[in-house]
Amino acid sequence: MNQAFICDAVRTPFGRYGGALSSVRTDDLGAIPLRALMQRNPKVDWQAITDVIYGCANQAGEDNRNVAHMASLLAGLPLEVPGATVNRLCGSGLDALGTSARAIRSGEAELMIAGGVESMS
């Protein structure tokens, strides 16, 4: 069985309820760490990403229903890179990480992006 490693980590910004980030859509918020990840790792072949998996429990309003894929497109990842959004309430981001690790360990994937994003305002 393959080993899975976390190669880099970027934190989404956070704020207070009704604060400066309250008007930022969840998919736009999710694109911020993806852009930073791409800038910090210029040698990565971004087309080699097997999948982008994001946890998001509150997919409502004008947010895109597949926050992971829309955030990846907004960040500039290739259209061909798929995305999946996991809803496991408070554990959504952790579930996305576990799903990605299992895909790598089982040989289904070689390079994944996993994370979580939420906007409660």
Predicted segments with their positions:
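Conserved active-site "lid/cap" helical segment
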Residues: 1-71, 75
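Acidic, glycine-rich active-site loops and adjacent beta-strand->loop/helix elements
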Residues: 10-13, 55-59, 88-92, 116-121
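Conserved catalytic cysteine-centered active-site region
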Residues: 24, 56-110
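Flexible glycine-/small-residue-enriched beta->alpha junction loops
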Residues: 105-106, 110-121
